[in-house]
């Protein structure tokens, strides 16, 4: 049936799924997109960086370099809407 719209995941849905998978209580600690991920690495307390493909250096090369400089883990994750997603460390969470 081609009359039904294709079911695609929205960016918001993907961010919510990431928050749930990584037990992040505040959705504001999930920063999807190349720009937001870069900002997390430059101005925030990053916990982990998720990338669709570590070999995608044309788009995320600077993210990989910043993560290495700051000793932040980079994990390949099956992102569908974004190439990268920064996860911010919750300084108030019980670890």
Predicted features and spans:
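Extracellular/luminal Protease-associated
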Residues: 28, 32, 41-60, 64
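Short basic, glycine-rich beta-strand/loop surfaces that mediate nucleic-acid
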Residues: 61-95
């Amino acid at each position: 049936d081609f009359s039904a719209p294709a079911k695609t995941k929205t960016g918001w849905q993907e961010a919510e799924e990431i928050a749930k998978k990584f037990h992040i209580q505040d959705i504001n600690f999930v920063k999807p997109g190349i720009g937001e991920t870069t900002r997390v690495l430059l101005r925030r307390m990053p916990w982990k960086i998720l990338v669709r493909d570590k070999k995608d250096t044309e788009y995320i090369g600077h993210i990989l370099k910043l993560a290495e400089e700051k000793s932040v883990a980079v994990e390949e994750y099956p992102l569908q809407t974004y190439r990268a997603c920064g996860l911010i460390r919750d300084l108030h969470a019980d670890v």
